[in-house]
A protein has these predicted regions:
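Non-catalytic DNA-recognition/assembly elements of restriction-modification systems
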Residues: 1-28, 35-40, 138-189
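Short Ser/Thr-interspersed hydrophobic loop/turn segments at strand-loop and sheet-helix junctions
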Residues: 6-18, 31-40, 58-75, 108-117
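Basic, amphipathic alpha-helical recognition segments used for DNA target recognition
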Residues: 6, 92-141, 145
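A short beta-sheet element
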Residues: 68-108
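Short, surface-exposed loop/turn microsegments at beta-strand edges and helix-strand junctions
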Residues: 22-29, 57-60, 77-89
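Short alpha-helix capping/helix-loop boundary micro-motifs
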Residues: 49-56
Length: 189
């Protein structure tokens, strides 16, 4: 099985906003920060607005992969995203090229991210990822149909886990409601 470096199959964009060099614009743009990217591929779309002119390459697109540069433990695959939302400081956008399935690359990166961070941060107080370490990540290149099968399986398993978690939350709400109603009918406060 052959492998390729991530830099050969994807464009890697480090988002670093320098306020001292940033240009201002008259209309605000919408930004996502590190805190918006949560585990289990959850992306909170509570954007912040800024009048800083964003770099075009920081625009988030469907099928992008987002990695936190500092203390990464997971990645976020962008399945859907509203228009004109940008990634803010300390985020990395990986845009996979056409010849490789993006969910497959997301699965590989999600499995390797802790190790990449640990290797990249020897002696550092806070673990982070450097460009050279990320560019050199090897991705096994398998038949495209197998990439689709594995990538979709990975993504759907995350979606299933989110639905199971939500079902447990709803069952807890239902249980608490029933118990509270029962207590009220017995004369409790």
């Amino acid at each position: 099985m052959r492998s390729q470096k991530l830099c050969d199959i994807a464009e890697i964009k480090f988002c670093t906003v320098s306020l001292s060099r940033a240009k201002q614009q008259s209309e605000p743009s919408n930004w996502l920060a590190c805190a918006n990217f949560l585990a289990e591929n959850v992306v909170s779309l509570n954007t912040s607005e800024s009048f800083i002119t964003p770099e075009r390459e920081w625009l988030l697109q469907k099928d992008d992969i987002v990695i936190k540069r500092i203390t990464p433990t997971f990645i976020n695959y962008i399945d859907t995203i509203p228009e004109n939302i940008y990634c803010g400081n300390n985020l990395i956008i990986v845009t996979v090229k056409n010849n490789v399935y993006s969910k497959y690359v997301a699965m590989i990166l999600n499995n390797k991210i802790k190790y990449i961070s640990a290797e990249s941060s020897v002696g550092a107080v806070m673990k982070s990822i450097s460009r050279p370490d990320l560019e050199l990540v090897t991705v096994p290149i398998i038949d495209y149909q197998k990439q689709v099968l594995l990538g979709d399986f990975w993504f759907k398993s995350i979606e299933l886990k989110k639905k199971k978690t939500r079902l447990i939350e709803l069952e807890n709400i239902k249980r608490n409601y029933i118990l509270n109603q029962y207590i009220l009918t017995l004369g409790g406060n």
